[in-house]
């Protein structure tokens, strides 16, 4: 039994049930076919009875209508209203007669039914035709106002014959319906016995199938379910026995293989969970340390950014002062240039004065020469006056006066010459000094120009320095922002590392729920922090100072 496969038992069971189902289907089809035939016959008999009865009933109603017309004719009702009523009744009688003929034709054209007496059908047709002809002639005679001919017709005999035949036909029809009902009852009883026998066979087969399922499927499946529940409880120490080549044996073998794989997986997961837990703890510690140092770096960057802002303000102020100094230097240079031009004008004027003084000296020399010659002439005149005696005394007086004037003129000319020479000497000295002052002013102008250029270069350099410091400040601000973001990321990383540590701990606890055979446990190798996460305060401080 252990080597019997479930699929073989299922196929055998399906074959048995298919055979039983086939037999049941054949019997059921036979019973249904018989019932269907009986039902068709009963339906056809009912239809024929309805149509034949309808035709006979319509004929009787038609005769009643005709009798009403005949009664009115007997009463000699000849007024127009009565005549109209009789004509209407005769018309209705004709329509009823046509309807009766229609019902009878439906009966004649209906499906033939086995077991019926053809002679009885012929009698029914003859009685109908007889009654139909009598009623048709009655309508004709009454319309022709031939009451005598109408009275000679024996409608009652025709109706009696028709009713007699109809009663016989109804009796035959009832027998056929009863026969069909009896056949249906017999078929039903036979089907009941057949179904009972088949049900008994099915119960016996089900009992054998149940016993087979107990041994082949249910008991092995219960043992497998017990092993599965044991595995679900975390106990992997129970060994699973796999026997036979059936599906349950294959399932047990697969479950045993799964248990061995699960044992290896749980062992590996347990060891790796320990390693992950250790590494996660170290990562969490490193992330916390990195977060702290990142916060310190962010604080230092904030202070640096503040210092850079102050330095930027100072350099900007120096730039403004340098620009103002450049403007003042330009003003001083322009003033020095103007002073140089004034000194040049003074030098030119002093040169002109020197030239005029030299001309005055020349004129004084001429005056001195004239005075000398006048003195000589006065001396000669005095000599001549002395020679003249009394006559030349007045001339001598004049000559003496002239001589005195000439002497005074010569003396004055000498004094003027001395003064002019002193003036010329001083003018020369002043011209030299003014010339030297002009050279000095030129040197001052050149120096002020150089100072102006240097101040311009200083202002330009200060401006460039201010821009550079602003860029550095912006870079420091961006670094501060990035450091803040890094600090947030490091905090998130630390939180993730802590969460990983918690999850690793939960994984260890989850794996600890499994019980396996004692095996040599592999020690969890602690993971070392990478150099990027190793704290290096000295290096960081040195780099920060360099920055």
UniProtKB/Swiss-Prot annotation:
Positions of post-translational Glutamate methyl ester (Glu) modification: 303, 492, 501
GO CC annotation: plasma membrane
Methyl-accepting transducer domain: residues covered: 272-501
Keywords: Cell inner membrane, Cell membrane, Chemotaxis, Membrane, Methylation, Transducer, Transmembrane, Transmembrane helix
Keyword Transmembrane included in the entry's annotation: yes
Domain HAMP: 215-267
Stretches for region Disordered: 317-336, 518-547
Transmembrane in keyword set: yes
Residue intervals annotated with topology Periplasmic: 30-189
GO biological process, one term: chemotaxis
The family this protein is said to belong to: Belongs to the methyl-accepting chemotaxis (MCP) protein family.
Protein name from the UniProt record: Methyl-accepting chemotaxis citrate transducer
């Amino acid at each position: 039994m252990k080597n019997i496969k479930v699929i073989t038992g299922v196929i055998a069971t399906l074959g048995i049930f298919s055979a039983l189902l086939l037999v049941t289907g054949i019997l059921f089809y036979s019973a249904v076919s018989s019932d269907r035939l009986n039902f068709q016959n009963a339906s056809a008999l009912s239809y024929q009875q309805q149509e034949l009865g309808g035709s006979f009933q319509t004929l009787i109603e038609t005769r009643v209508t005709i009798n009403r017309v005949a009664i009115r004719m007997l009463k000699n009702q000849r007024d127009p209203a009565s005549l109209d009523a009789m004509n209407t009744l005769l018309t209705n009688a004709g329509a009823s007669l046509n309807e009766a003929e229609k019902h009878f034709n439906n009966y004649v054209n209906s499906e033939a039914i086995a077991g019926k007496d053809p002679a009885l059908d012929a009698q029914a047709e003859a009685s109908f035709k007889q009654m139909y002809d009598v009623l048709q002639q009655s309508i004709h005679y009454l319309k022709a106002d031939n009451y005598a001919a109408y009275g000679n017709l024996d409608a009652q005999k025709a109706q009696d014959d028709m009713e007699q035949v109809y009663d016989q036909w109804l009796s035959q029809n009832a027998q056929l319906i009863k026969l069909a009902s009896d056949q249906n009852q017999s078929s039903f009883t036979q089907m009941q016995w057949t179904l009972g026998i088949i049900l008994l066979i099915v119960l016996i087969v089900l009992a054998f199938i149940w016993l087979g399922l107990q041994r082949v499927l249910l008991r092995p499946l219960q043992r497998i379910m017990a092993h599965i529940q044991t595995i679900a409880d975390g106990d992997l120490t129970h060994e699973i026995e796999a026997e036979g080549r059936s599906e349950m044996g294959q399932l047990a073998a697969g479950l045993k293989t799964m248990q061995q794989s699960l044992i290896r997986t749980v062992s590996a997961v347990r060891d790796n969970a320990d390693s992950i837990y250790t590494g996660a703890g170290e990562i969490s510690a490193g992330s916390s340390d990195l977060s702290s140092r990142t916060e310190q770096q962010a604080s230092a960057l904030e202070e640096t950014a503040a210092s850079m802002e102050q330095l930027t303000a100072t350099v900007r102020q120096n730039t403004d002062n340098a620009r103002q100094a450049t403007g003042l230097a330009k003003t001083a240079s322009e003033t020095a240039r103007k002073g140089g031009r004034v000194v040049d004008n003074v030098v030119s004027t002093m040169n002109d004065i020197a030239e005029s003084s030299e001309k005055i000296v020349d004129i004084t020399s001429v005056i001195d020469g004239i005075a000398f010659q006048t003195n000589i002439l006065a001396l000669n005149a005095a000599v001549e006056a002395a020679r003249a005696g009394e006559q030349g005394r007045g001339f001598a007086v004049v000559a003496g006066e002239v001589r005195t004037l000439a002497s005074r003129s010569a003396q004055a000319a000498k004094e003027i010459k001395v003064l002019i020479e002193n003036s010329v000497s001083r003018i020369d000295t002043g011209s030299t000094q003014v010339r030297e002052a002009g050279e000095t002013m030129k040197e001052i102008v050149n120096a002020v120009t150089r100072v102006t250029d240097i101040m311009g270069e200083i202002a330009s350099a200060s401006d460039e320095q201010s821009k550079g410091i602003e860029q550095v400040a912006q870079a420091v601000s961006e670094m501060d922002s990035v450091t803040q973001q890094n600090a947030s990321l490091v905090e998130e990383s630390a939180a993730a590392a802590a969460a990983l540590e918690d999850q690793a701990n939960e994984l260890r606890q989850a794996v600890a729920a499994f019980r396996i055979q004692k095996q040599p446990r592999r020690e969890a190798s602690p993971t070392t922090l990478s150099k990027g996460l190793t704290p290096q305060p000295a290096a960081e401080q040195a780099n920060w100072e360099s920055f």
